[in-house]
């Protein structure tokens, strides 16, 4: 397995496909890729003012993560994974949890100001405080989110079933007729009690 936790954004849009192709090449058959990405919603609810989000993004690009340009809508990320040869198994939205994580980071940052100021300038401390506080706000109102994606290296049917058995043990172990009944319909195994 290979994991990438919020680093794909720093690869950049121009290098995203190449990055995913390299990960795919490094994985063994039936290998699993766990990727956590910061993302943006595709669209906004009618009347939602997203200028604040745009300003936050520009602030991040200039002062916090220069060149990190791949915080994208989830559909774009999924398409990139599929084009690189991955099969997406699961997508889990961590947005509400992540806003709480950001809040804890902000509180910790503020509580350690003296220690941080011994190493970094006051200007750097303030810049990161603004970034963390703004990130909490943007995440809470849905302007950004974090997704955890489980993807596997696509392969033959045998490989696919092995991957599924690893991710969901026992589900695919029954022979086809026992799972689907004669003629392909549901068997008694799955209809008892319904």
Feature annotation, model-predicted:
Residues 1, 30-33, 87-88, 148:
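Beta-sheet entry/capping signal
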Residues 1-2, 143:
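A short acidic, Gly/Pro-enriched loop at the edge of an enzyme's catalytic core
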Residues 3-8:
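A conserved beta-strand element that flanks and buttresses the S-adenosyl-L-methionine
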Residues 10-17:
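Active-site glycine- and acidic-residue-rich loops that bind
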Residues 17-32:
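A short glycine-rich, Lys/Arg-flanked "PGG" loop and its adjoining helix->strand segment in the class I
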Residues 36:
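Alpha/beta-hydrolase-fold catalytic nucleophile elbow
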Residues 39-159, 166:
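Substrate-binding/catalytic lobe of Class I Rossmann-like enzymes that use SAM or dcSAM, i.e.
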Residues 164-194:
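Short, cationic low-complexity segments
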């Amino acid at each position: 397995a290979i994991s990438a936790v919020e680093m794909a954004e720093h690869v950049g849009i121009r290098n995203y496909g190449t990055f995913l192709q390299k990960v795919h090449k490094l994985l063994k058959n039936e290998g699993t890729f766990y990727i956590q990405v910061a993302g943006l919603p595709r669209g906004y609810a009618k009347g939602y003012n997203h200028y604040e989000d745009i300003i936050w993004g520009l602030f991040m690009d200039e002062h916090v993560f220069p060149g990190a340009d791949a915080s994208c809508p989830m559909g774009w990320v999924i398409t990139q994974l599929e084009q690189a040869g991955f099969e997406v198994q699961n997508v889990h939205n961590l947005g509400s949890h992540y806003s709480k994580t950001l809040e804890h980071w902000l509180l910790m940052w503020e509580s350690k100001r003296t220690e941080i100021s011994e190493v970094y300038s006051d200007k750097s401390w303030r810049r990161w405080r603004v970034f963390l506080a703004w990130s909490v706000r943007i995440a809470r109102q849905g302007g950004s989110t974090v997704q955890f994606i489980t993807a596997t290296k696509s392969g033959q049917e045998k490989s696919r079933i092995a991957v599924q058995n690893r991710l969901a043990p026992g589900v695919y172990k029954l022979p086809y007729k026992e799972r689907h009944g004669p003629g392909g319909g549901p068997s008694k195994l799955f209809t008892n009690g319904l």
